[in-house]
């Protein structure tokens, strides 16, 4: 299904009162009204997430940031705050990217040894935590590269009760195929020689991603075809995937939008929006997410 959203509304959201029972309190709480969780993962690292408590009888919502970002990134923060007004429990994790207790975004030139699979294990940690709080299912929302993560997680863990995936600004590979192929060949060669040194790669928006071969290859694997394959598998499982994109997003093109139309449950284009970096279309996006959540909830409520 293909829909266009042109709603000009910029509605004010009623603040939600949240019980301030916190596992850790920072001097400045970056997401309005959210508590900040700091939990230790099985590998010993501390993992950080924004958390807003909601109705345990409804699916919890996990909101994941884009590549190398955090829940403090403006787009992610807006999504978390706006969804919280609907009464859902929200968790917005920071992927650690190999750094215990990571709070800030990570630079492209920083040393990267983390992998895509490491990220999926951390998502699984937070989904497990939500299940322990009494939520029977979860809805996964990803922004930008966070969409690849939630697709990968849902595909590789078919027994996890994911009610739906919402991919906001689902990007395609941003490097030309010859460039990507050359980089992959070099990284594979280094890996075969057991060369674990950090080397520069072009990846996502990074012109210089300083990563180990294993780190780079784990993300480079998620090219356009890999995303389409994931969407196809979820389509075969009849698991709904909703894509929301901006009509002025320079990181997408018409060819990619047509691919999404073929493989996602529903694609919504918000007129005038870019990668949702601007707050100008914040409430248009919020309205669309609210409508999608109503669609997801309808079968469960027998409507």
Residue map of PLM features:
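N-terminal cap/lid segment of alpha/beta-hydrolase-fold proteins
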Residues: 33-54
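Short, surface-exposed "cap/lid" segments of acyl-processing enzymes
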Residues: 56, 61-95
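Cap/lid segment of the alpha/beta-hydrolase catalytic domain
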Residues: 97-114
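Alpha/beta-hydrolase active-site loop
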Residues: 111-132
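Gly/Ala-rich beta-loop-alpha elbow adjacent to hydrolase catalytic centers
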Residues: 142-146, 150
């Amino acid at each position: 299904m293909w829909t266009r959203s042109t709603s000009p509304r910029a509605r004010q959201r009623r603040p939600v009162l949240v019980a301030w029972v916190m596992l850790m309190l920072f001097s400045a709480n970056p997401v309005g009204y959210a508590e900040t969780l700091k939990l230790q993962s099985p590998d010993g690292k501390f993992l950080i997430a924004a958390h807003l408590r909601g109705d345990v009888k409804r699916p919890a919502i996990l909101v994941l940031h884009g590549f190398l970002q955090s829940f403090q990134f403006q787009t992610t923060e807006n999504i978390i705050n706006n969804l919280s007004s609907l009464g859902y429990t929200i968790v917005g994790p920071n992927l650690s990217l190999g750094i215990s207790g990571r709070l800030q975004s990570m630079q492209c030139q920083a040393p990267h040894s983390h992998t895509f699979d490491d990220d999926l294990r951390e998502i699984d940690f937070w989904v497990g935590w939500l299940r322990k709080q009494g939520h029977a299912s979860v809805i996964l929302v990803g922004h930008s590269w966070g969409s690849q993560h939630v697709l990968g997680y849902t595909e590789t863990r078919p027994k996890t009760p994911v009610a739906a995936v919402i991919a906001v600004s689902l990007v395609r590979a941003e490097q030309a195929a010859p460039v990507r192929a050359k980089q992959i060949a070099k990284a594979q060669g280094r890996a075969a020689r057991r060369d674990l040194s950090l080397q520069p790669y072009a990846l996502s928006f990074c012109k210089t991603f300083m990563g180990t071969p294993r780190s780079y290859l784990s993300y480079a694997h998620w090219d356009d075809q890999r995303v389409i394959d994931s969407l196809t598998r979820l389509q075969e499982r009849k698991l709904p995937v909703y894509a929301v994109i901006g009509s002025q997003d320079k990181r997408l093109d018409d060819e990619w939008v047509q691919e999404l139309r073929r493989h996602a449950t529903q694609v919504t284009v918000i007129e005038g929006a870019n990668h949702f970096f601007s707050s100008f279309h914040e409430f248009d996006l919020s309205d669309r997410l609210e409508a999608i959540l109503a669609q997801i909830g309808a079968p469960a409520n027998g409507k």
